[in-house]
Amino acid sequence: MKRLGFLFLASILLLPNAAPAQVASPAPAASAPAEAAGVVRETLANGLRVIVLPNKLAPVATTYVSYGVGSDDDTMPGIAHATEHMLFRGTSDVSGGQLADIAARMGAEYNAFTTDEYTLYYYKFPAAYADVVLHLEADRMANAAIRAQDWATERGAIEQEIRAQESRPLHAVSMKLRERFFAGTPFATASAGTVPSFEKMTADDIRAFYRAWYKPSNATLIVAGDVDPQRTLADVHRHFDAIPAGEVPGRKPIEVPPLASSSLEEPIDFPVGVGVLAYRQPGSNDADYAASRVLAQVFSSGRGALADLTATGKTLGVLSFTNQYPEMGAGFLLAIPARGSTPQAAQSLLSGVLDDYRTNGVPTELIDAARTRLLSEQAYQQSSISGLGLAWADANAQHRTPDAVYAAIANVTADDVNRVLRTYYTADHRLSIVLTPKPSSTVPKTDPSAGVEHVGFTPTMHEPLPAWAQSALKAPLHPPSGEIGARPHRLANGMRYAVRRETAAPTVVVSGVIRTSPLLYEPKGKDGVHLLVDALLPWGTTTYDRKGYEAQLDAIAASAALGESFALKVQAKDFERGIALLADGMLHPAFAPSAFAIVRANTMQSVALADKLPKTKAELAQRLALYPPGDPRRRDVTEQTIAASSLDDAKRWYRFAFRPDETTLAIVGDVAPERADAAIRKYFGAWKAAGAPPSFRFPQLRAKAKQAQTVTVKVPTNVQSEVTLKQVFPMRRDDADYVPLLLANTMLSGEGTGSLLMEELRTHRGYVYTADSDFNVNAAGAEFSISFSSDPKNVGRANAAVVAMIKRLQSAPLSAVELQRAKALLLAQRVLPLDSYAGVAADMLAGVKDGYTESDESWFWNALLRTTPGQIQHALRRIDADHFVRVIVEPGS
C-alpha cells in the first residue's frame, strides 16, 4: 500500500530525538493520581538508583539501565555512541557471543541508544529470567572488556550505521539546520559521530571513556513487569552492591544563546518540497515546560487550525513535533504543499495559524482537551509493561517522577499556554526553512578506506555458556501456558469478537480487522479505491461531521482509528460511549462529495510522490520480477488509477468489502465480558452484509524458469547500497515445512548480533551494520527474503556470503544448541508482545487477515518443539540460493 509517510519525512528531515505530538492519546484521568501503588525505590550504598514497578499483565519483564552520559560529554565526536556499541561486545567474564547466546536462550529482546544527555540499555524478557538479566547488566557496568580486536570490527559496523544516516535524502540539510538552530551549544554537532572520528578512535579511548562515566553512582536501574519487588531488590543488591561507587567527571554547563531570526533555503533530493518553521521552547528544567507540552498537543489536535489546512486541501499534510533537552526545547511545524502550491506558500499558512493564535488566543476547548489527553497517558502507561518502564526512564532523565510530570500538566492554565506561545513562537526568534525539490546529479564521495573488512580478526564462534548461565537456562522449553486468547463469540450477522478481562489499567483497547483483498477484487484501472475509502472514514459520519466526531472523542479522551483495520482506546468507565462512536464511524460514514474531492486530490498527490521514491521503484521492480504476467500481485496503485476512481466507486467498494461476516474484534481491558457483549450486540448487531462472502484464493504460484535476476535503482544521494534478495513459492501454514522454515528464519536474523546473518556479515566481516531476513506465509503463498545495507564495494562480498550460508544450511544440519536458541526465541516472541493491552489484542487477531487462526492452536507449538535439525535442513531446500530476485538501491545517477 502506497502512502507518503509524514512521520517518516520528519524522521529523515531534522533532528534525532524528535518526538511527534500525537493527535489522540489514551483514556483520561481527571487529575494526576498519587504515585502508582506498589512502586519500590531504593538507592544502594554505591549510589545506584533502583526503581521496581510491579505489573502482572503478562509473565514478562523489562529492565532499563540509564547512565548519565551522552554525546554532550563526548571527548571525541561519537565516543559515547561507540561505547554503547562496544558494551555489547562482551566483558571479562562473558564474551560477546555468549552474551548473544544467553539472550537468545532467554528469548529476550535487547538494544540500547545514545542521546545527548544519557545512554539507555534495555532488555525485554520472560520474567522468570529477571535474575539472569540483572547479572548481565551488573557485569556490563563493572567489567566491559572493550578489546582492540573487537573495536577493529565494530568500527566497520558503526561506520555503516553512519553511512546509512548519510544516505537519507535530507541528511545534509538537517546538519545545516542543526548548526544554525543550536549554534553555540553541543547540540549543534552530529551526536552519533562521523566516519573520520571513528577512524581515529582507539579501543583505549573508548575504555577510558567507559571507566570515567559508567559508575553505579551515575546510573538508574528500572525493573518493570511480573516481578516480586522485594525479591528483585534482593537480587539487585546481590549483583550490584560490590561495584564501587566511583566518581564521574563534572558535566559542563550548557549556555543557550538567543536564537536570532534567520532563513534557510535549500534544494533537496526529494520529490516534494517542505515549508518549516522552527522555534525555541522551554527546556524540561523550565517552569513552563508543562505548558509547552500542552501547546504541542494543541498543535496536533484534529480540531485545530493546523489540521484544517489539510482538511481544506491547502496542504498535503502538516506535522508538529518537538525536541526536548533540560536546557532548552525545540518546536517544529512542517507543511507539505498541496499540488500547485509552493513550500513558501505552505510555510505562510503555518505562520498565519500562529499569528491568529497569538492575536486571538488558543481556543480554550482545545487547551482543555489537550491537557486531559496528556493526563490520560498516565492511565495507559499501566496497560503496557514496557511503556510503564520507559515512562519512568524518561522522567528519570528529567530528574523527576512521572507523577511530578503529570502534576505539572494538571496545573497548566490557558494563560500559561498563551504566554508560552506569545513568548517563544515569535517571528523575531525563529528559523524559517524552505526545502525545494531538486533531484541531485552528484554522487557523494566516500572514504575508500572506511568500513573495510578486517581480515585479521578471528571470528567469534558460539561458545559454551558460563556455569551460572547454564544453570539458570537449563529448564526445558514448554508451550505458552495459561489463557492467552479468549473464547470467540459470533453475532447473528457473522461478526466475530472475543473479550479478555485485564485489570492492570482502568482502560480498554478494542482492535478490529476486516478481511478484504483489493488485489483480487478492485475494479481494473481503479486500483487504490480502498485507500480512498479508508481515508474518507475519518471525515465524519451521518451523525457527526469531521470536527464533531473529533469533539465526541475529546469529550471522553478516547482515540479511534477507522478503516479496514480499526481500533479504539477508551477509559473503562466510557466503554459503551466509545463503542458507540467506533460503530458510528465504521457503519455510518458520511461520504460527503466535498470531502471526497479533497481526499482524492491528496491521495493522487501522495501516490505520485511515493512513486518517485527509490524504495517504491525497487518494490515494484521486485514484484514484476517475482510474479508472472496476469498475476494480481503485479497490480499497482498509480495516480491515474486513483484519478479514475469516483465517489460511487468508493461507496461500492465500501458496501462490498466492509461486511460483518469478514470482521473480527478483540476487546482487552478492564471490562467484564457480559458488559462488552451487550455493547457489541447493541451497536454492531444491526450491521448487514451485502451478497455472498468473497473468496480470497489467489492463483497458484507456478515454478518459473530458474533465472537469477538483478534490478538496480540509482539514487544520487545514497552513500550505501541497500540490497534485498527475495523468493516466492507455494505454501500454506499447514505445510510440513512451515514451522521448520520459521525456525530457520529465526536463526538467520532473530537473535540480534548472535544471529547467523549478523555473525557472518557484521561480527566476522564488518560488511554491514545490520542484516535481516523475513519469512511470511499468507493467502497468496510464501515469501522469503534477506536484506542488508553496505558500502557499494562490499555488496558482492556480502551477497556471496549470504548464498554460501544458505547452501551450508542446506547441506548440513544445524546443531541442537542452535535449534534450542531458535525455539526459545519463537516461544518468547509469543509471550513478549503480551506485555500490553494492545499486544494482547493483536495476538487475538493474529492471522485473521490471511484467514488463519493457528496462533491459539496447540498443534503449532507441538510441531515447533518436535522440529529436528534435519527437518530444518530439508525445509531450507525450498530456497534456491542461486536464483534470488535481487534489488539493489545504490549510489549513482
Where are these regions (language model features)?
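A structural supersecondary motif
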Residues: 276-278, 299-337, 385-388, 724-728, ...
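M16/MPP (pitrilysin/insulinase) zinc-metallopeptidase core fold and M16-derived inactive scaffolds
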Residues: 62-124, 190-192, 300-315, 327, ...
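Buried hydrophobic packing residues in well-ordered domains
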Residues: 47, 65, 81-83, 103, ...
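Bacterial N-terminal signal peptides
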Residues: 5-16
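Scaffold signal of the M16-like zinc-metallopeptidase fold and its non-catalytic homologs
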Residues: 90, 133, 165-215, 236, ...
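M16/insulysin-pitrilysin zinc metalloprotease superfamily fold
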Residues: 89, 93, 124-155, 233, ...
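Acidic/histidine-enriched alpha-helical segments
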Residues: 104, 145-163, 228, 247-261, ...
